[in-house]
Regions:
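Hydrophobic (often cysteine-bearing) scaffold residues that line and stabilize catalytic clefts
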Residues: 88, 126, 146
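ATP-binding N-lobe of GHMP and related small-molecule kinases
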Residues: 2-121, 131-141, 172-175
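Short, contiguous, pocket-lining structural segments
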Residues: 121, 125, 138, 142, ...
Length: 175
């Protein structure tokens, strides 16, 4: 099923806040929390946002652009993206692989959090990209489903287990 001409004009925007961790850190990783009954993590969302914007394109071309890192990649199709061995922008590329969109688009990301700042900018990016691509591919996901997708993809990319606490502020805000 292709996108209608009117939907080619519809840009999708998703934003997610970063977070500050006060206590608990990695105690939410399995099986660590099993060894510390009653342990809690405490963090809160901050007004430092990560944004993902998807603009439909005619044809099959997929463009990835990070405004904050000034990186850019272009693939002639989803199949070309799947065949690539390395990516300049691995986080959005892997989320795109998961959702397997049928149409071409431009995905632009921008984070107010500098890379390596320790406030879960990558987790916020994963949530924003997951939300935007879910809308673009017309998938109706719960917030918990988005968390599981983002968390598992990021763990695969960084080859390190990831806990839940980085993703909840990006999904729900607050403390």
């Amino acid at each position: 099923m292709g996108k209608s001409p009117s939907s080619l004009d519809a840009t999708i925007v998703a934003q997610a806040p970063c977070r500050v961790d006060l206590a608990g850190g990695t105690i939410d990783l399995w099986p660590l929390y099993l060894f510390h009954p009653g342990a809690l993590t405490l963090n809160f969302a901050v007004n430092i946002l990560t944004e993902c914007r998807i603009t439909p394109l005619r044809g099959k071309r997929i463009e990835l652009r990070s405004l904050d890192t000034r990186k850019h990649e272009v693939f002639s199709s989803f199949d070309a993206l799947m065949r690539a061995r390395n990516y300049r922008l691995p986080l959005p590329a892997r989320v795109i692989q998961f959702f397997a969109p049928k149409e071409g688009f431009l995905i632009e990301t921008n984070s107010e959090s500098p890379a390596g700042a320790g406030i879960s900018g990558s987790s916020a990016l994963m949530i924003a990209a997951t939300a935007a691509l879910a809308r673009f591919t017309e998938r109706h996901l719960t917030l918990e489903q988005m968390r599981v997708i983002a968390q598992n993809i990021e763990a695969q990319i960084i080859n390190v287990p990831t806990g839940c606490q980085d993703y909840y502020p990006a999904l729900y805000g607050g403390i």
